[in-house]
């Protein structure tokens, strides 16, 4: 079965948190570890803190993000440049 025919995946606990915040009509940060969840139109306007493996990164959800996954907006790997090692010529002497 192709993915287009299936409903988008959203973790139940995340969906419950979104509905609870929508009922309160308050703005608060929602913390989640579910990077595989799809962004639904009900999430637009909320700030969701998504786990990147080390910490939670807050992301404000906008309309162009609908239909994509939460994990796409939080990188898990950071490239460390080797320029600092090259500039340190005193340690080579």
UniProtKB/Swiss-Prot annotation:
- Cellular localization per UniProt: Plastid, Chloroplast
Domain of life of the native organism: Eukaryota
Spell out the Gene3D superfamilies in the cross-references: 30s Ribosomal Protein S19, Chain A
Chloroplast keyword on record = yes
Q: What Pfam families does this protein's entry cite?
A: Ribosomal_S19
Could you tell me the Gene Ontology terms of the biological process aspect for this record? ribosomal small subunit assembly; translation
- The main location is plastid
The terms under GO molecular function for this entry are: rRNA binding; structural constituent of ribosome
Query: Has UniProt tagged this entry with the keyword RNA-binding?
Result: yes
Instruction: List, alphabetically, the GO terms of the cellular component aspect.
Output: chloroplast; mitochondrial small ribosomal subunit
Known InterPro entries for this protein?
A: Ribosomal_uS19, Ribosomal_uS19_bac-type, Ribosomal_uS19_CS, Ribosomal_uS19_SF
Protein role: Protein S19 forms a complex with S13 that binds strongly to the 16S ribosomal RNA.
This protein is called what?
Small ribosomal subunit protein uS19c
Species:
Lolium perenne
Q: Which gene encodes it?
A: rps19-1
